[in-house]
């Protein structure tokens, strides 16, 4: 009788430790979090990935740029006050002189080959990072409407 109870207890413990339920629980939590996040926050999160891969080498992970070469995005009046020009620069590149935070920059930023969604996402990320605060989401439709 003792061996039967011990065997039954062992089976219950093994079945109770099944990892599938835990994995499903984590998956459900991730799904819930994604549903709770606003479209802007989802875009910002995707934009962070694009920024890290495409933009951070010149504008730095801190968004502070490189003095006299690449303008800062952190606290940038050009970025936050010139929405159309900023979208155009990310989408098509930028050549020529600009003034950022009262300092001139005269370099070349090549087009990075991003699609409209990636441009919108990286714009939302940069416009809401490092102290920048923009509540109006940049959409892929808005980016598509920006012509060279």
How should these model regions be labeled?
Residues 2-9:
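Sec-dependent signal peptide recognition
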Residues 23-50, 145-146:
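Electrostatic cytochrome c docking/interface patches
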Residues 40-66, 78-92:
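Sequence/structural segment immediately N-terminal to covalent heme-attachment motifs in c-type
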């Amino acid at each position: 009788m003792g061996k039967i109870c011990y065997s039954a207890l062992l089976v219950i413990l093994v079945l109770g430790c099944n990892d599938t339920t835990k994995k499903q629980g984590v998956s459900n939590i991730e799904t819930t979090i994604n549903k709770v996040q606003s479209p802007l926050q989802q875009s910002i999160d995707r934009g962070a990935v694009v920024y890290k891969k495409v933009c951070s080498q010149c504008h730095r992970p801190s968004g502070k740029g490189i003095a006299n070469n690449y303008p800062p995005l952190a606290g940038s009046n050009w970025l936050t006050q010139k929405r159309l020009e900023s979208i155009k620069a990310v989408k098509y590149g930028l050549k020529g002189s600009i003034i950022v935070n009262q300092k001139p920059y005269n370099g070349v930023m090549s087009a990075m080959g991003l699609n409209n969604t990636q441009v919108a996402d990286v714009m939302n990320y940069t416009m809401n990072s490092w102290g920048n605060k923009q509540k109006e989401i940049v959409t892929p439709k808005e980016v598509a409407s920006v012509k060279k």
